[in-house]
Amino acid sequence: MSDYKKTLSMPNTNFEMKANLSVKETKIQENWVLEKIEKKILAKNKSNTPFIIADGPPYANGDLHTGHALNKILKDIILRFKASVGFYTKYIPGWDTHGLPIEQEMAKRGLNKNANQTITEKRKNCKNFAIENVYKQRDQFRRLGILSEMDEIYVTCDLDYVIRQIKIFNKMLSKGLIYQDLKPVYWSWSSQTALADAEIIYQDVESDSIYVSLEILDKNEFVSKGDKVIIWTTTPWTLPSNLAIAANPKVTYCRVQVENSVYVISKNLVEKLAETLEWTNYEILSEFSGKKLENLPYKSPISDKKCKIIVDGYVSDSDGTGLVHNAPGFGHEDYLACKKYNIKPYCPIDNLGKFTGEVNDKELAGLFYKDANPIIIERLAKKKLLLKASKFTHSAAHDWRTKKPVIYRATKQWFVNIDKISKEIVAALNKVKSIDNTIIKKIKEMVLNRQEWCISRQRIWGVPICIIYDKDYNPILDPKLLNNIVDILNDEGINAWYNEDAKYFLTDSYNTSKKYIKETDIMDVWFDSGTSYSVLQADKLGYPADLYFEGKDQFRGWFNSSLITSVAAFKKSPYKELLTHGFVLDENGNKMSKSLGNIIDPLQVCKEYGADVLRLWVASVDFSKDVSISKDIIAQNAELYRRIRNTLFRFILGNLNGFNLKKLRGAKYSEADLYVLSCLSNDIKTIKACYDKYDFKQIVKIVSKNVADLSSWYFDYIKDPLYCEKEDNEQRIAIQATLYQLLDSYLRILAPIIPHTCEEAYEFFDKKDKQKSVHLEGFTNFKIDSKYKVDFKKWEEFFDLKDKVYSEIEKTRNEKVINSKGQAHITIHSKSLPFDEQTLERYLGVAKVEFKVKEKDGTTIKVKNSKYARCERCWNYYPTNLIANELCERCKKVIGNKKI
C-alpha cells in the first residue's frame, strides 16, 4: 500500500495548539507598548466622536482581587469595541489614595507613632505608601491585558488634582451649599472621625432594652402632676444627656391607671405595653392628643433636671410607648425636633467614646459609653424608675473599615446641603440613560434620602478643608482669601497648609495682629473621588463622561458623591450613562474569604491559564447580578478558550496555507459556503448589537455555539476538498475564501474579549492591507452580497435530517455493522429531500444516499454497510468498480503522473 500523505494539502500553520498564554501574553503586551498600539488607535480616531469612560478609582492599598479584575476587564472590553467602531476612547485610570486605611497601615508599621513627627512627615509616609501601591496595582492591571498603557493616570493626592478639588469645594461654598454646624453625625470612636452614610455597614448586635417612667412636674387640664410618662430606649448611656421627651401632636394618648400609678402612653400601644410590662389590671382614665402634652415639665431620669415635653411628627406609635427620649447630642431626629424649641445639643462623650467631665458625674466620667449601661440601669432601678430591662438583638451601624459600632455624636462638622439641590439632582438624573431602568431609580432614591452629607473628617491624610477662622472661631468665607489660599498651595504644595501659620495665607486686607486659626479637618475621601470628573475637564476629554461603570456598592459611594458635587458645582450629572455590576462570589454564592479558602486570585489565574481565559470568564457572566468564580468555573472557560483557539483559529489558519488572496473576489461559493457566510453576516449584526448594549455573555454564547456548529459539520465536510483536491480547484478556493472571511471576522469580533490570542492569530494571518495589530483593524464590516440568496428553511430541514441520520449511524456503529460513517449506505423514506442524493452524500460524508418517496408525514432512516471499497488517499468509499489501484477517479486525476 502506497503512502499518499505527501500528495495531500494538509493544514500547516505555526500558530501553536498549546496556548502557553502566561509567557506569550506578556510578550504581546510589551509589543503593544513598543509599537504604541494604544496611541495609534487614538490617533486613528482622534477626529471622531469620543466615548469616554470615567474611571472610578480603586483604593491604593494591597493587591488586586477578582472584583477589580471584573471591573477593569469589563471597561476594557467596552473601550476596545468602541475604538474598533471608530470612537475616540482615551481612558485615564485613577487611584483613590487618601483615607484612614493608609493611616492605619502606617500605624501597623510603626511609621507615624513618633510624638516628635510633624503632620507633614506623617503625610509624607502616607503618600509614599499610597504611590507605591498605585504603581504595584498599575502593573497588575496591565497583566490583565488592558489596552491603556496607563502612562497617563490620575492620583487623588497629586497636587493638580487636589487644587481642582479645593476649587470645586470653594465653588460649592460660594453657592451656600457647604456649611458648618454642630449636629449629630455618625461618629466612629474606633477611627476617631465622623463618617458619611457610605462608610456605614450594618451588623447584628445585642443591646439593652429598657422601659423607664419619668415624673411629670406640673399639671394641665389633661394631665395631673405626678403622672408618669413612659419611654423606651435601647441606649441607656444616652439618658444622662436627656433634654426632652417627644410626643406626636396627632397621635392619641391616654392616662392609664395601674395600681397606684398613672402612666401616660399612646392609646394604640396600651395592650402591647400591658403585656410587655405585665399589667394584670389597668384602667384607661382619659384620652387626648399629643399636642396637649407640649411644654409640660418632667424630671430627667439621671440628671434630675427639669426638662419639657415637645411635639414632633417623627414620633411613631407603632412600637415603644409613643413617647421618645430625646438626647439632641446623640440622635439626628432628636436634634431636629429639639432645634425647633431652641434646645441645643449636649454631648458629654469624647472622640474615643468616653464620658467627659462635662457629664458632671464622677462615676461616669472617663467611662466608655457602653460600660455605662449597667451603672445607669442600676441607678434607674434604685430610683424606682425602671419598669423593665431585657436584652434584644438588632441591626446596628458599624464603621465599614474597623467593623466596630458607631454612635451618633454632636460635633462641629462641615456639610453639603443636598436638600437645597434635590430638584436639580432629579432634573440631572432624568437625562441619564441606562440599560436597566432600576439603576436610575436606585441612585435617585439613594441621593434624595440624604438631606445632607457630612464631608469633614478628623484625620491628617487627606485634602485639607482650607478654611481660616477668626478669634471667635467663625469661619471666614471671603472669596479673595479662599482664592489666595489656593494660589499659595498651588505654588508651594499642599503641605504648606500644615507648615505655615494661618496668617501666612491672609491677604493684605486683614489685620495680622489679630488671632486667626486654621481648620484642621480634612475632606471625606468620597469628596476626593467624587470630583474625579475634574480630570476629564482638565484634559478636555468631554464632560459629562459617556459612562460611569462600577460595582453596585457605588450607589452609596462614587456614583452618589460624584452626582452631588457635579450638580452642586456645575448643575449637571457627571455621567450620561450609568452601569453597574454585581459582586464576585464563589460557586456556592459565598463571599471570598481566607477562612473559607475560596479566594480566587486573578493574577494566579493569569499565571496558570492566561489573562484571556480570565477575560473570557468575565465576558461570559451576567455581570448585572452577583457572579460566581471558582477553579472549576475557570477550568470550564479554559476549555471553551481551547475550542476557540484550536477549532476555530488554528484549523482555519492551517487551511489557509498557500491561499492566494487574489482569488477572494472571484470565488465561486457552494450552497454550503453561502449558508455559512450568511450565518456569519447575520451573527455579526447581532453581535454588534450585543456589544452596543453591553450584553457580552450573549456574544460568548453565539461564538461558542458557532464554534460547535462549524466543527460538527462544515469543518468536517470541507476537509475532503481542502486536503484532497488540487490547490487551484474552484471548490477548494471557495472554501478557503469562506474560511478567510470567518477568520477575519472572528478575530475582530473577539479582539475586545481575548485580545492576546486574537493578536497572536493575526500575526499568522496573511490578509489584505494588514495592520500592525488586529486592534487597528476596526470591527468587522463583512456583509454577504445581496445577490446571494440562501434558503434557510431548506437548511433547517437539512440539519434536522443530519441529526437523525447521524443518530442512526451511531446505533449502527455500536452494532459493529459499520466502522465509520463513510461506509454508510443511507436510505431515507420521506416526502422530500432538502438536497439531491449526491449533494447529501457530500454534506453528510456517507458512501451512498438513497431516497424513497413516502406519502405520509415523517421521515424514516435506515443505515446499512455500503460494502464499497475505500480510496486509500481520500478515505472515501466508492463502488468497487470505481476504485482502481487503491484510488478513486478524483484522486487519480489529482495525483496524475506524480511518483508516490
Curated annotation (Swiss-Prot):
Single Gene Ontology MF annotation: zinc ion binding
Entry protein name: Isoleucine--tRNA ligase
Reaction(s) the record says it catalyses: tRNA(Ile) + L-isoleucine + ATP = L-isoleucyl-tRNA(Ile) + AMP + diphosphate
Gene Ontology CC, one term: cytosol
E.C. no: 6.1.1.5
Keyword ATP-binding: yes
Position of sequence motif 'HIGH' region: 58-68
Task of the protein: Catalyzes the attachment of isoleucine to tRNA(Ile). As IleRS can inadvertently accommodate and process structurally similar amino acids such as valine, to avoid such errors it has two additional distinct tRNA(Ile)-dependent editing activities. One activity is designated as 'pretransfer' editing and involves the hydrolysis of activated Val-AMP. The other activity is designated 'posttransfer' editing and involves deacylation of mischarged Val-tRNA(Ile).
UniProt free text on domains: IleRS has two distinct active sites: one for aminoacylation and one for editing. The misactivated valine is translocated from the active site to the editing site, which sterically excludes the correctly activated isoleucine. The single editing site contains two valyl binding pockets, one specific for each substrate (Val-AMP or Val-tRNA(Ile)).
Gene3D superfamilies in the record: 1.10.730.20, HUPs (3.40.50.620), Valyl/Leucyl/Isoleucyl-tRNA synthetase, editing domain (3.90.740.10)
BP term (GO), one: isoleucyl-tRNA aminoacylation
Assembly and oligomerization: Monomer.
Cofactor(s) it depends on: Zn(2+)
Binding residue positions for Zn(2+): C871, C874, C888, C891
Principal location: cytoplasm
Entry note: cofactor: Binds 1 zinc ion per subunit.
Residues annotated as binding ATP: K594
Species name: Malacoplasma penetrans (strain HF-2) (Mycoplasma penetrans)
Highest rank taxon of the organism: Bacteria
Short motif ('KMSKS' region): ranges: 591-595
Annotated keywords: Aminoacyl-tRNA synthetase, ATP-binding, Cytoplasm, Ligase, Metal-binding, Nucleotide-binding, Protein biosynthesis, Zinc
Residues annotated to bind L-isoleucyl-5'-AMP: E550
Family matches, as InterPro entries: aa-tRNA-synth_Ia (IPR002300), Anticodon_Ile_BEm (IPR033708), Ile-tRNA-ligase (IPR002301), Ile-tRNA-ligase_type1 (IPR023585), Ile-tRNA_ligase (IPR050081), M/V/L/I-tRNA-synth_anticd-bd (IPR013155), Rossmann-like_a/b/a_fold (IPR014729), tRNAsynth_Ia_anticodon-bd (IPR009080)
Recorded family membership: Belongs to the class-I aminoacyl-tRNA synthetase family. IleS type 1 subfamily.
Localization (cell): Cytoplasm
Keyword Chaperone: no
